[in-house]
Amino acid sequence: MKQTLLITLLSFFLFSAVAQDHFAPLDQWLERETPQMGGRAVLLIYKDDKLVYSNSENALTRRQKMAGRWMARRQKKEVNLDDFTPNSKIPVASCSKWLSAALVMTFVDEGKLQLSDTVGRYLPVLSQQGKGQITIRQCLSHLTGIKAPELKESLQQMKNISSMEEAIQQIAQMPVEGAPGTVFRYSNVGLQIAGAVIEKISGKSFEQLFADRLAKPLNMKQTDFGSKAVALPAGGASSTASDYMNFLVMILHKGQFNGQQILSAASVAEMQKNLVTDQVRIAYSPAEAGFTIGYALGEWVMEKGTEGSRTVSSPGLFGSFPWVDKEKGYCAILLCMSIKPEGRHERYQELKKLVDSLL
């Protein structure tokens, strides 16, 4: 019995050592790149029903930590700059779009909404301003045809908004640059409209809908859209690497998580269909996103596969990079803060290529 136990333990430690050795290039990449990604980063990789890689780096200098604490005090926030783990919560910016699109799809699954529904049916103010024929599908894919302001201006405008109704009234006044479905402009407006629609249908706040329909069943205990007057579906979520990984696992498993069907497989597949064809004019696409293939519902199509999209992703302004590779059967997330826009897409590609080579 003792001999069997000893052999089992030795085998376990030998396997662990080999696994650590195998992923050493990833450790080295994370250590090298973290100073360029805001000084703190977490990388998780999931394959074959388990986490196969988990590592974090904190490269903040003493001076950077002092500056961060001073800024936090000014903003009356609590901050821990000494630790950065898979359970550290940070704003994830446009990674929110993937979550919000999935939330909208829960209404599609229930038959309460169709992607072909026009928004004027639910929000008459948009019809009054000539925007009522925009569809829910176009809202989730940045194909509304609305010429939204630049990101900084858009966020500044949202600071003065006190209700979802006021946010939609503001969007209704924005100029149009093309017919719905003909122009791609990456912005916050489409997701904001979709968020207002599901609030209208349900009579509940966007934050509550997210908590009930996604956060709770996916055990995303530290993920939310804040407590501001108006939720920002396109970029207002805060999360942890561990929480967001649960969402990615659900997407990888065609809507299933822990034996529960959160989204239908059909909805997950619909979310991954590229809608930005050669006939669509690109009015604005962030350079750091590296527009190479297209955009679906709340997510970029990074790579084509044998059956449509192979890899889908939804990177955020602050540098976090979640992705799902359907053909290789894994998902991963790089969670970080303040990554520089220059060379960001190349860094994402380098990381994914390295991960692919190790799996």
Task: List the model feature ranges, each with a label.
Residues 1-21:
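Bacterial Sec-dependent N-terminal signal peptides
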Residues 90-93, 184-186, 321:
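Catalytic tyrosine of NAD(P)H-dependent dehydrogenase/reductases that use a Tyr as the general acid/base
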Residues 13, 95-101, 133, 186-191, ...:
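Short alpha-helical patches at coil-to-helix transitions and adjacent helical residues
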Residues 20-57, 73, 158, 199-204, ...:
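Catalytic loop of the DD-peptidase/beta-lactamase superfamily, centered on the K-T-G motif
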Residues 61-82, 342-350:
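A short, polar/charged loop-to-alpha-helix boundary motif
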Residues 86, 91-95, 109-147, 151, ...:
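Active-site helix/loop module of the DD-peptidase/beta-lactamase fold
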Residues 69-78, 155-179, 204-224:
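Short, charged, amphipathic alpha-helices and their helix-cap/turn boundaries
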Residues 30, 43, 49, 90-116, ...:
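Active-site SXXK
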